[in-house]
Design a protein with these regions (language model features):
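Extracellular/surface-associated beta-sandwich interaction domains
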Residues: 1-355
Length: 355
């Protein structure tokens, strides 16, 4: 497709995927030990891709002392982590933990199943709001929904149909002039630029009328209001972690049987298979495979996937125990998940009052 990509002097090849990648890191005390990675994967080919998987093939080499690494996974929070079994790296320096976690894994919005166990079936992050529906409409398993989102029945409310998890908040235009004043609560109804009155870079109501229109707004590739579609990870029916493997670094030979990333069929079997296995072999130089799938990627569609690279120090006694306890790492995962779901809006001091 020369109208999409140009490879000078070479024919078009490959799957026809366009991948945008962004990495984020902050010096905020809550998140300075984590790196956020966002992937936007678009199918720009002429075909539907029925089975796709996304994952990492990693030669960890913790502490540059790679002969004694080990790792573990937790499918409930979509995280894996590895460490040096004696906690000593090159030059005798202490080593920590390196973890990978899905903050947002691929979504399966067309299989008529509740893949993430939140009581919703086939929720999406790109559907348009069409009507306000009842408090329990759209929920397939009420008890699972309440447990997953930590809600009570009385917390449920009438909501826009495309806001499946009911967290988009309308504003209160008290004087009815169609514009939120600083003294009025604007909630999430701040327009697709994502900036509300009194916030940095606010230049007035959105020209397209999406601010103060009392409905969630989203335009693909342009913007979105908070807690809706692209800014609300919970509105995806996520597959989660489906494949975790660790094995000794294989031969570099270009064999169709070697577990090496240059061998397509072998790699598909690794990342596309539903295989979650704890490594119980001899401690050595190990490769880690961490993946999610399969999922369909239809022509013209975009799949959003977000990862976090996590680092912590946890006691070796817990790591090398049967439970592989890593409390500091688990707490960091909890924190970065909240940060991601709040669209990287860290805790801030109160706004300066107007006198």
């Amino acid at each position: 497709k020369p109208d999409v990509t140009k490879q000078v002097g070479k024919p078009w090849g490959g799957l026809g995927l366009r991948v945008d990648v962004r990495g984020f890191q902050w010096n905020n005390p809550q998140a300075r030990d984590a790196i956020f990675w966002e992937y936007s994967i678009a199918n720009v080919s002429d075909y539907d891709l029925r089975d796709v998987a996304f994952g990492y093939w990693v030669d960890n080499g913790i502490g540059n002392d790679n002969a004694d690494d080990i790792g573990y996974f937790d499918a409930e929070i979509d995280m894996s982590y590895s460490w040096d079994i004696n906690g000593v790296g090159s030059g005798g320096l202490p080593t920590g933990i390196m973890g990978f976690a899905y903050l947002e894994s691929p979504g399966l919005a067309y299989d008529y199943q509740d893949n993430d166990g939140d009581g919703l079936t086939d929720e999406k992050r790109d559907n348009e709001p069409t009507a306000i529906i009842g408090a329990t409409e759209g929920i397939t398993d009420l008890s699972s929904f309440l447990e997953f989102y930590k809600l009570e029945v009385e917390d449920l409310k009438e909501h826009w149909d495309a806001d499946e998890d009911q967290d988009w908040q309308d504003g209160e235009d008290l004087n009815g002039d169609g514009i939120y004043q600083l003294a009025e609560y604007y909630g999430d109804d701040i327009g697709i630029d994502g900036v509300g009155p009194g916030e940095l870079n606010y230049n007035g109501p959105d020209a397209d009328g999406s601010e103060c229109n009392h409905m969630p707004d989203f335009v693909e590739g342009v913007g979105c209001e908070p807690n809706f579609n692209t800014t609300d990870v919970s509105e995806s029916d996520m597959v989660g972690l489906t494949s975790f493997r660790m094995f000794p670094v294989p031969s570099h030979a270009a064999s169709n049987e070697t577990e090496w990333f240059k061998n397509d069929q072998v790699m598909w079997n690794l990342v596309g298979g539903d295989t979650l296995e704890e490594f119980e072999g001899n401690i050595s130089n190990l490769v880690e495979v961490f993946a999610s799938g399969p999922f369909p990627l239809f022509q013209g569609r975009v799949e959003r996937i977000s990862m976090s690279e996590l680092h912590s120090y946890d006691p070796l006694a817990g790591l090398n125990s049967g439970t592989h306890a890593a409390p500091a790492l688990y707490e960091l995962k909890r924190i970065v998940q909240v940060i991601y779901e709040k669209d990287y809006r860290f805790a801030q001091p109160p706004k300066m009052p107007t006198i």
